[in-house]
Amino acid sequence: MADRVRRPEYKHGVLVVYIAALFVQVLDATIVNVALPALAEEFAVSVTEVDAAAIAFSVALAVSIPPAGWLSDRYGSKTIFLGSLALFTAASALCGAAATLDQLVAFRILQGVGAGLITPVGSAMLFRAFPLEERAVAANAVLSVAVIAPAMGPVVGGAIVDNASWRWIFFINVPIGVVALVLGALWLRNDESAPAGRFDVPGFVLSSLGLAGVVFAVSIAPDVGWLDPLTLVCGLGGLAAFAVLVPLQLRLDNPLLHLGLFRERLFRTFNLVGIFFYAGFIGLLIVLTLYLQTHRGYSAFEAGLTQAPQAVGVFLLSNLAGRRLYRRFGPRPMFIGGTFGALVFTGVLVFVSASTPLWLIGAFMFLRGVSVGTVFLPMQTAIYSNIADAQLSRA
């Protein structure tokens, strides 16, 4: 009886641990951006130069995602999940202690590797733990964290930068990460999965070159220009690597990337659309926060507060969607309606000017959050709805 009190049902244990890990990972993606001016001042460089730390994180995260499924199948999902969370947590502490910009960039690379493994391995564990009919509930809980945490990042980061040291935007990850590690060690288990087979080295090299090239090109283009030689070389080089990678992966019996999964219509559609949707969601948070600080003179905390209404909108609609709308209408109408609303209110925010009051920006952010909250639940649930449990780690 005592053991039953201490240990939750397995699926709930997976949910708690994954949500905690996802929270610090997603929070970190936006909490750092509000501190870029403070980091530039600390290291006596421009904001553009400090952005190298963010670019390093993004590239490392992208490169570490493709091998996540193979590593999970080969060494066990619990082992890889806790190992990646430990790496992310330790790297967060090192980032907070960084004495130079070069050190910060190096430690952000380690952070990115850990972060890139957490989400695919953790989400596969979660959807294996929940039966198909309960996955909408699990997806709703994950959604609340995945969308609210980025909106909280600028608020929390702004408060930290204005009232403490920038180092705490990294140190804040450590206690949450440690708690998640302890609970994960107690509650998680290695799932059964398909045999890992041999590691696809050519696939890993090509996917790394492709992802690193494209992510790096997209990251630097706003500063140096889309036609800059470096942007073109990296971007086109990355696309060329993908052009070689795709037919190679389709020919192999045990590829690193199981591209055959994209034959499943829902998986293909929601993955491809979701890439652009989430990029736009995070991108506006970053741009708006920096604009309010550097062009309108608001403090980091004030700039971060403009993101709070969006978090409220997401929370309200994601919970309503989870309980009623998804059961009644299914994923397609919700996704189309929410996407239309998100596009409209994102477009409105593009025209924010020096005379636009903060309350109006906040109102549009709330409406954008309402739209986004309607989209992410059906997208998250439908992606894995027709994928066999044995293939979830590769999906």
Name what the model sees in each region.
Residues 36-39, 122-126, 160, 188, ...:
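Hydrophobic alpha-helical interface/terminus motif in multipass membrane transporters
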Residues 87-97, 114, 176-183, 210, ...:
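Transmembrane-helix signature of multi-pass solute transporters
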Residues 65-203, 355, 389:
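Helix-loop-helix hairpins in multi-pass membrane proteins, especially solute transporters
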Residues 25, 54-57, 61, 88, ...:
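Structural signature of transmembrane alpha-helices in multi-pass secondary transporters
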Residues 12-34, 47-57, 67-69, 202, ...:
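12-transmembrane solute porter fold
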